[in-house]
């Protein structure tokens, strides 16, 4: 058995699930998601929990077992609680603001960078240097957060740019001349 795949998924109250040939649908207070899965696997509800089962121990089924269980668990968590990824801006004059639903970043370019959120994702700016990306689809929220970070990745020498909150950036030392002549002669 897959260590991940055999774990049951708790279904919170207010969340309804429906499984039809290869499609898992879940509806909750935050919205509705559809997760396609391999029709060889079965998803059944048992005492308020979901169980993902595989028909055999073939390599293909073992590989899909844990993946499907995780995708279903993410969908259930998304429609009940949602997902939030926090980003922060580091750098002199770097700031963010909301322009309607769009995110406007001033991050060292000659023009502000405007990012429109796709359907199902919202931006929040609690402080000028903090950005919250939220939504019900974990994959989409993560991809949008990565796209925002990609606009200005943290540089290797000063760490200026857009980073995930708590992300450690390994800074390079810089030129030996900048350290007071302690390099090779």
UniProtKB/Swiss-Prot annotation:
List GO terms (cellular component aspect): cytosolic large ribosomal subunit
Key words, A-Z = Ribonucleoprotein, Ribosomal protein, RNA-binding, rRNA-binding
UniProt entry tagged with the keyword Transit peptide: no
- A single Pfam family, by name? Ribosomal_L6
The family note in this entry says: Belongs to the universal ribosomal protein uL6 family.
Species of origin reads Deinococcus deserti (strain DSM 17065 / CIP 109153 / LMG 22923 / VCD115)
* GO MF, any single term: structural constituent of ribosome
Write down the superkingdom of origin.
Bacteria
Which GO terms of type biological process are on file?
A: cytoplasmic translation
Q: Does the keyword Thylakoid apply?
A: no
Purpose of the protein: This protein binds to the 23S rRNA, and is important in its secondary structure. It is located near the subunit interface in the base of the L7/L12 stalk, and near the tRNA binding site of the peptidyltransferase center.
Q: Subunit structure, briefly?
A: Part of the 50S ribosomal subunit.
**Protein name per the record:** Large ribosomal subunit protein uL6
């Amino acid at each position: 058995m897959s260590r991940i795949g055999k774990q049951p998924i708790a279904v919170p109250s207010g969340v309804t699930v429906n499984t039809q040939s290869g499609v898992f649908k879940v509806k909750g207070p935050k919205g509705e998601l559809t997760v396609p899965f391999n029709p060889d696997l079965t998803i059944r509800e048992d005492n308020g929990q979901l169980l993902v089962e595989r028909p055999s121990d073939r390599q293909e089924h073992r590989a899909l077992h844990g993946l499907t269980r995780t995708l279903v668990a993410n969908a259930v968590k998304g429609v009940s609680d949602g997902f939030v990824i926090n980003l922060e801006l580091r750098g002199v004059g770097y700031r963010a603001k909301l322009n309607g639903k769009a995110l406007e970043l001033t991050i060292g370019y000659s023009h502000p960078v405007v990012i429109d959120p796709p359907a199902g994702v919202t931006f929040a700016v609690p402080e000028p240097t903090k950005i919250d990306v939220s939504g019900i689809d974990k994959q989409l929220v993560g991809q949008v957060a990565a796209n925002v970070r990609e606009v200005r990745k943290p540089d290797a020498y000063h760490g200026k740019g857009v980073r995930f909150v708590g992300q450690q950036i390994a800074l390079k030392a810089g030129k030996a001349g900048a350290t007071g002549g302690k390099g090779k002669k």
